[in-house]
Amino acid sequence: MIGRLRGVLVEKQAPEILIDVNGVGYELQMPLTSFYELPEVNHETMVYTHFVVREDAQLLYGFITKQERALFRLLIKTNGVGPKLALTILSGMTAGEFVGCVERDDIVTLVKLPGVGKKTAERLLVEMRDKLKSLMEASAGSEREFVLQSNYSPAPTVNSAEEDAISALISLGYKPPQASKSVSAAYKEGMDSETLIKAALKSML
């Protein structure tokens, strides 16, 4: 199993990246919370990975922290949640925010994420409660530490903020008209794409 990669970031287009490790290029998909912590292209980076083997493909998922990867692994063990939906959930909110939703039984916020219906949200709240407790105990011994380690201070991003934001939202499962409308409504002069995506997502939750 590939558990971690360190190499040069060759390409990045949310939610996918390409890392060159000693001449071998690895394609990964990442939640936006991790994606926007990456350095600029042609700089070295390190990501924790989760490897998925399917009949028709072999896929790598990347994460900036072990905590986010651990939460991803718990999510895909939930009935009805596959890697794609888990990635969408972790792109729509930080790991810490997800923990908060589970703690509060906040089904209203969860169902606003693309692909998360009422039944799926209910399963997440029920099945993740005990799993999260074990995860937090294993990672740091407290919810507070887990939440602190799972939230990021976003790095500056690229130009064409509106185009990048719309593309990222579509990749998460939002319909193009909805993505475009939300991005346009949230945009303010000088916003970078990461800030704009967060603002657009917040307006839809």
Swiss-Prot record:
Please give the CDD domains that the UniProt record associates with this protein: UBA_RuvA_C (cd14332)
Compartments, record wording: Cytoplasm
Q: Where is this region: Flexible linker?
A: 144-156
Where are the residues of the annotated region Domain II? 65-143
User: In terms of domain of life, where is this protein from?
Assistant: Bacteria
Is Cytoplasm there in the keyword field? yes
Region annotated Domain I, chain positions: 1-64
> Which function does this protein serve?
The RuvA-RuvB-RuvC complex processes Holliday junction (HJ) DNA during genetic recombination and DNA repair, while the RuvA-RuvB complex plays an important role in the rescue of blocked DNA replication forks via replication fork reversal (RFR). RuvA specifically binds to HJ cruciform DNA, conferring on it an open structure. The RuvB hexamer acts as an ATP-dependent pump, pulling dsDNA into and through the RuvAB complex. HJ branch migration allows RuvC to scan DNA until it finds its consensus sequence, where it cleaves and resolves the cruciform DNA.
Family, according to the entry, reads as follows:
Belongs to the RuvA family.
* Domain comment, as recorded: Has three domains with a flexible linker between the domains II and III and assumes an 'L' shape. Domain III is highly mobile and contacts RuvB.
The protein's name: Holliday junction branch migration complex subunit RuvA
